[in-house]
Amino acid sequence: MAAKVFESIGKFGLALAVAGGVVNSALYNVDAGHRAVIFDRFRGVQDIVVGEGTHFLIPWVQKPIIFDCRSRPRNVPVITGSKDLQNVNITLRILFRPVASQLPRIYTSIGEDYDERVLPSITTEILKSVVARFDAGELITQRELVSRQVSDDLTERAATFGLILDDVSLTHLTFGKEFTEAVEAKQVAQQEAERARFVVEKAEQQKKAAIISAEGDSKAAELIANSLATAGDGLIELRKLEAAEDIAYQLSRSRNITYLPAGQSVLLQLPQ
C-alpha cells in the first residue's frame, strides 16, 4: 500500500516537473529598453515587435531575438583626404539606436550585429564625401560647419537602414606630418612678424616723443629769448636771486657746513 502511494507521488512530481519545464520554456522576458522579434520555424521572422515584460511563445517552434533599443555610443576612426590632398585622421562619435518598428526588417536583411555591419561603412562613405569639399585649413576654421554637414548626411543615410542617430560629433581631427610642420612654421612666422611690428611701432612712438620733446625745448627757448628781449638784465638778476635763495636754504639744512661771511678771517688752533 505504501509503495503505491510513493509511486503515485513520484509520478505526480515527475508530471509536475515536466509541466513546469514546459511552462518555463514557453515564457521569456523583455527587459526595459529592449524589444523582441519572434522567429517561427515554420513561418520565419514574424512582422511584429514585442515590447517589455513577460510573454508566451510556442516552445521549440518559436524563438525570441532580443534587441537593445537604447542609445549606445560608437567611435569610428577614418583616414581620408581633404580638398587640397592633405591626409586627415578623423574619429567620429555616434550615439545610435534602432527604430523599434523596423527591427524585423533589420534582423532579416542585416542581422543582430547590424551596428557592426552598417555604421563603419556608411560613416567612412559620408566622411570622405564631406571632407573632400574642404581644404585642410577650412577643416580647422570651419569645424562646426563640417560637423553639421557630416551629421545631416549621416543621419539621412542611417535612416535608410532603420537607425536613428541621436548625436554625431567630431572628437578627433589631425593631419599629416607635412601639413602639421607647415602650420607650425606659419605660426612661428606670424609671431616673428608680430614682434617686428611691435618693434617698429615702439620706434615710431619714441620718434614722435623725441619730436615733441624737441618742439617743447624749442618753444621754451623761444619764450626765454622773448622774455630776455622784453625784460632785459632785470630777468637775469631775478633768476640769480632765486638761485641764491635756493642755495642758502640748502646750506642751512646741512649741519656739516659753516657759512663764513666775506672779509673775515678764522683762526684755527693747530697742534704744536
From Swiss-Prot:
Alphabetical list of CDD domains matching this protein: SPFH_prohibitin
Molecular function as annotated in GO: complement component C3a binding; complement component C3b binding; enzyme binding; histone deacetylase binding; protein heterodimerization activity; proteinase activated receptor binding; transcription corepressor activity
GO biological-process terms attached to the record: animal organ regeneration; antiviral innate immune response; B cell activation; cellular response to interleukin-6; DNA biosynthetic process; epigenetic regulation of gene expression; mitochondrion organization; modulation by host of viral RNA genome replication
Organism of origin: Rattus norvegicus (Rat)
Tissue: Expressed in brain, heart, intestine, kidney, liver, skeletal muscle. Highest levels in heart, liver, kidney and intestine. Also expressed in flagella of epididymal sperm. Expressed in lung tissue and pulmonary artery smooth muscle (at protein level).
Main location: mitochondrion
Name the record gives this protein: Prohibitin 1
Coiled-coil regions listed: 177-211
Location in the cell: Mitochondrion inner membrane; Nucleus; Cytoplasm; Cell membrane
Modified residues (N-acetylalanine): A2
Phosphotyrosine, modified sites: Y249
Gene: Phb1
Modified residues (N6-succinyllysine): K202
Similarity comment text for this entry: Belongs to the prohibitin family.
Induction behaviour: Induced by PDGF.
